[in-house]
């Protein structure tokens, strides 16, 4: 049907053209010649257009196009048919582009001067376009780049044009009578379009392109992922934390390193592409906010990655340490990675495989090995916690440094940390601005300003300015200050204000969670502890508890008072008889190590206890000195220092002497007088060295449950955090009936039996002959006594210097006398808790519970 209609239309159109030509006569001969030229050009373009027609006709219109092309070839020599074909070839182009159609209409009106032909062409073209669309543009329009680019603007037309470029050479060979110039014209057209093809084809691809990211992790591995081009910083950070199985992700961030010492934090609220210069998206995963107290972190895996960050800081020189601190931190690193020392597995030079310091020496490695060999049954998680507890005390812990100059042009360094803004000059801190004193922080061009709150004697606010290298550096410092102040000082983040017309200033706000919100979220974590691999040994993080207590060469491993607490889990012995006058003493020894000269590990001191009291509990720690007091009712506790460590566990000597005072048996009277003469000096030195009390890991455990009811079969308390304790128990029953009868020969006086029970819990310590032979030089000593109606508390503080190391020891004794039953667990817990609150940086190494009960027989 379509073929018949198209042929009839062509016949009518040819007759119409012939009649019109005869009417016009010779006056239109010039126009006819022009139309002949156009017809010849159109016929030359037929060969190039046939390939496209065949491809498009493959959709179901093949018969129509084949008949039409055959008809064109048969009537190509006819003048009227040439004009008809010219109008047909021009008109479909106007259906594709309205602008081209208007140009074609204007040319046809000028060249032929008739409206009837155009109307007829429109009526015929509508059917032809629906059935067999013809896209054969004029030759002069093919070379117009603007029109070609316009035709490439849609994605749907792209495949047809690519197919059209493949066939023109083969199709031009089929056409006969085609001029050479028209053939070259057809060849140039695909080349010009091929040059413009990459530009047009890239547009839709870029619109949906994903970006490849590389993130260097703290364990020296690289995490690669693909993110959407418009992804924000928080999207990438979340993916990295999911890869690492981290839930406490607010302490971490992604950084871009401008240089080896300068980094820029990726803003989590902005798109990544707006913050990254260049195509390669390479980031590093780092700790952004260093927690002031790492013990408050909920999960071990979070503390482990914090340890990895601090190790990088130490090796890179961003966290300077002394030799002793490097050795101590290095030993905890080895313990965390390798576990307990095993000579068969580790050999003699295993520490050299680890990078522990910027300038690692053989001497440092030997010291690390010596300390590592002294640790027994310390879990990786406990070693990480000990590492963090020592690292957080360093002056440069968690300080983000920025180079600047003061108003006089002197080079300084500004440090931002959790407590405030620090100012350093020549590697020394010269000023500190805590966050509570800072009212406002701002920047203008390359200057950075802080407004300080006036003091008590000041009446006006003061503004301090600093000069930074560039505007970008000033803005970066300002952002870091805003983030640290918001995270550590505020309970919630501020909402970003709505944009106002011509609003001045930056809209930047910290968009993450604050530390308070992070702790609340961490408290809701109820998943089991995740298993992860240590970087060096690839050893799964697991508990190393259960190993027998062994000797330590240099110092007792102390998991921050956890051992002492977990160790003191026993108070009640077998069968409690009737108590008439129970007396209980709790004695807590604590030791503090200070490093005035060359720092080294404090050597543990051992104390012999020669006791005579009714019922006592003694808790010594691994580096304690002596504090002793008269136990009450004419009974004294005598403390002796052993020359050699050959004490029998649980051995106690009881002496009845009403006038015997507590003294060190190995010290002369002159030394004792010196002790009492320097009490004021000791008090001053001790109070200066004690920091603010802060809650420790043990205090948290005390608040949740009481661990004083369980014991292992071998008498060792199952502690998860501390070294094993050696428990000894001694029960002595003395018969005082004979003495009473000799003094008071009365039949009414009952016979009294005294039962004494002593339970000792002590951290495992090694034999150190040198330390015991050299008692050290005693600097100061102080004794403080307080009494109530039912208890007496005695605290003795001594300070000695041994081998260039200052050592402070505190011993506390509590004696409770009463007729009622006493909750020994509660007394012990309270004594240890008070000791830790008063001296949070000391450790409890020994607990001795001494109980004496008088049994009357009627």
Swiss-Prot record:
Chain segments carrying region Hydrophilic: 495-608
Segment Disordered: which positions? 1-125, 155-208, 518-636
Localization, UniProt: Nucleus; Cytoplasm, Cytoskeleton; Cytoplasm, Cell cortex
Q: Which GO terms describe its biological process?
A: actin cytoskeleton organization; cell division; cortical actin cytoskeleton organization; positive regulation of protein localization to cell cortex; regulation of calcium ion transport; regulation of cell shape; regulation of intestinal absorption
Name where it mostly resides: nucleus
Enumerate the residue ranges of region (C-terminal (CTD)). 710-858
Where are the compositionally biased (Low complexity) regions? 31-50, 78-89
One matching Pfam family: 4_1_CTD
Residues modified as Phosphotyrosine are: 223, 654
Q: Where is the composition biased (Polar residues)?
A: 616-629
Gene3D superfamilies documented for this protein: 1.20.80.10, Phosphatidylinositol 3-kinase Catalytic Subunit, Chain A, domain 1, Pleckstrin-homology domain (PH domain)/Phosphotyrosine-binding domain (PTB)
Molecular function as annotated in GO = actin binding; calmodulin binding; spectrin binding; structural molecule activity
PANTHER family the record matches: 4.1 G PROTEIN, PROTEIN 4.1
Q: What protein does this entry describe?
A: Protein 4.1
- Please name the source species: Mus musculus
**Which gene name belongs to this protein?**
Epb41
